Each structure stands twice: as structure tokens, then as C-alpha cells.
Amino acid sequence: MKEFVIVTDTTTDLPREYVEKHHLYMMSLPYTLEGTSYTWENPMPVKEFYDKMRAGSLPTTSQANPEEAATLYESILKENDVDILHIAFSSGLSGSFNSCRIAAADVCEKYPDRRIVVVDSLAATLGQGLLVYKAVQLKEAGKNLDEIAVWLEENKYHLCLLY
């Protein structure tokens, strides 16, 4: 069974400690609030973020483009002999999922012995994070990439998210 890594987006709102402990790779999806841009590396404090939203400010996001996704995938594949499972931000909320599928196809042409499976979470925030959490549990229990991808595809429809 080939080793694989899990990639997800910063939209999962998973704690940084969890991400680091489980060696997850994060695709940074920047957001802008009141004219200032924030990233995974430079976030706005959570309390401040929600205080501003309660006061009427609305954040806007940027989707990942195929080049950014390809850069992330290639950096992983150059350093490791692994496949990639990417649990992506909802296709209903962003074009990032489609960008990641395009990037995965392009990168797999350069690395034909590797696989990149991109799963549309149909979720965001901790709904998406919950799917990542379960994928980590399944991986740690010895499930392979395909088994986890099937589980995600079958179970993502059982989430109920309120925005």
C-alpha cells in the first residue's frame, strides 16, 4: 500500500496544532475583511473576525488557481514518494475544487507513478474540518487512500451546515 498525505484548505478552521500534529498540508485560501488581506500564515484573530462580522463587515475570499494548487502538489511530490488525498472546499462556494482538479491532472502527467485524488467536501469551516478529522482517523486506523476517498464521497452528504 502506497503512502499518502492529506491536503486540505485553510477554510477548514482546524487548529494549527492539529494540522501540525497530523502532518496535514494546507492550501491557503486568502480572505479580505475591511480592505485587509489575511492568510493561514497571517490570520486575523478569531474573536476579532467574528466581532467584525457581527458589526456588519463581510469577508470576501479568493479561490485557489490551478498554478497555486500545482505548486503545492509538486512541492509535496518532489520531497516525498507519496500519493495525495485533497479534501477540498465546497464547489458550491468556490471554484477552488475545480482548480485543484485541473492542477491534479497536470501534475499527474509529470508524475505518472503518483496519484492525486481531489474530493469535493461540499462543505466549509468545521464541516469540512470534520471530514478531514475523520480521514485522519481512518488513515491512522490503516485505511488506504481509496477506502478513505470512498468513505468521504458516501458520507459528505450526511453533514448539515448552517451558514
Segments (PLM) and residue ranges:
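N-terminal glycine-rich phosphate/adenylate-binding segment common to multiple enzyme folds
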Residues: 68-97, 104
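Active-site histidine-anchored catalytic micro-motif
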Residues: 93-160
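Conserved beta-strand scaffold positions in the cores of enzyme catalytic domains, especially
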Residues: 26, 86, 116-118
